[in-house]
């Protein structure tokens, strides 16, 4: 009975919109209003389609070993990048795959949280329901917003977008979100905007042979002087990129920017030409941010550590994220997150 009722509701809404289009065409000048009308119609029809797909979606997942605690003991954080209609390579995920990921998580009982809720949980100041998790996106790519938002909307989910502010606010790119789009995202109530650096999301030359390494974790080769940066020059370059992005986004949105996603997931923990890079970065993060995010890939199976309460932490919290890409299977993703819920320190 319930499914028949839903189908009747969908059909009724479709008829209402059809009548609206006919009436609008009779009384309004479509040369002025057609774009807004058709965008609204397309948006609502897509929403109806997604709701119908969700109603019939099914996935069999393993939740037999999950914790039975009344409250969340760990919080899993996912990170996506671009969401093109068809994904060609890492780290992109297709719109269809993303939809299946979120449908499966919703069907499995998972609900999203905000950055504020995550911070309170990590500090031990707040309890969250079991199966709470956070969705994040890096880079501020247009497809991440346009293809994710309709799915977030029908599931009543929210997400965080980490923006490279110099690419979005200082340029009018066809690839990165612009300022108007970012404000539109915030206005939906489904998106939080945070920092992914100013322009430091690129590789820099580290020697006179043209070898390159990530911006944040290495000293830059100064060709003019035929040498590497000094310690102070490195510090000032990183300080500028971090503070510029935080201040630029904060001023633009009139909101506090208190979270940062590490570009290239590299803070000198793997390979660097400056052994003190990670210490300097940690000091700057403690100065400017409450939460700092980095990617984490499980080495084998489901053996990975999620994010736990840490009341003794005195600086920025390092938040581990599960990196999602073109190869991430829907069932294995849900099984991974389910497995993390059962692990205790």
Predicted region positions:
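N-terminal Sec-pathway targeting helices
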Residues: 1-17
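Short loop/turn segments at strand-loop or loop-helix junctions that form parts
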Residues: 78-83, 164, 195-199
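Active-site metal-binding loops of divalent metal-dependent hydrolases
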Residues: 137-140, 197
């Amino acid at each position: 009975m319930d499914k028949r009722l839903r189908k009747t509701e969908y059909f009724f809404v479709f008829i209402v919109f059809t009548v609206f289009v006919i009436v609008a065409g009779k009384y309004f000048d479509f040369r002025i209003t057609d774009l807004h009308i058709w965008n609204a119609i397309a948006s609502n029809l897509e929403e109806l389609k997604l709701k119908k797909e969700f109603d019939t979606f099914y996935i069999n997942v393993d939740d037999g070993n999950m914790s039975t605690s009344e409250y969340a003991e760990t919080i899993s954080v996912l990170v996506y990048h671009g969401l093109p209609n068809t994904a060609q390579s890492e780290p992109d995920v297709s719109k269809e795959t993303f939809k299946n990921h979120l449908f499966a998580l919703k069907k499995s009982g998972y609900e999203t949280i905000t950055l504020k809720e995550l911070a309170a949980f990590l500090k031990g100041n707040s309890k969250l329901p079991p199966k709470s998790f956070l969705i994040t996106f890096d880079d501020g790519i247009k497809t991440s917003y346009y293809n994710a938002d309709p799915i977030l909307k029908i599931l009543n989910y929210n997400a965080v977008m980490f923006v490279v502010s110099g690419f979005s606010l200082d340029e009018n790119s066809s690839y990165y979100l612009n300022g108007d789009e970012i404000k539109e995202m915030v206005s939906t109530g489904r998106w939080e905007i945070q920092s992914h650096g100013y322009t430091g999301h690129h590789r820099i030359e580290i020697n006179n042979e043209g070898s390159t390494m990530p911006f944040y974790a290495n000293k830059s080769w100064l060709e003019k002087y035929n040498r590497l940066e000094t310690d102070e020059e490195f510090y000032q370059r990183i300080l500028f990129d971090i503070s510029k992005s935080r201040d630029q986004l904060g001023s633009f949105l009139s909101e506090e920017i208190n979270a940062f996603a590490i570009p290239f997931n590299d803070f000198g923990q793997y390979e660097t030409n400056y052994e003190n890079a990670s210490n300097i970065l940690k000091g700057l993060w403690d100065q400017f941010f409450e939460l700092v995010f980095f990617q984490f890939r499980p080495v084998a199976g489901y053996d990975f550590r999620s994010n736990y309460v840490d009341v003794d932490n005195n600086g920025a919290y390092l938040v581990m994220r599960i990196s999602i890409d073109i190869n991430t299977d829907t069932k294995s993703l849900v099984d991974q997150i389910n497995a993390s819920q059962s692990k205790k320190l």
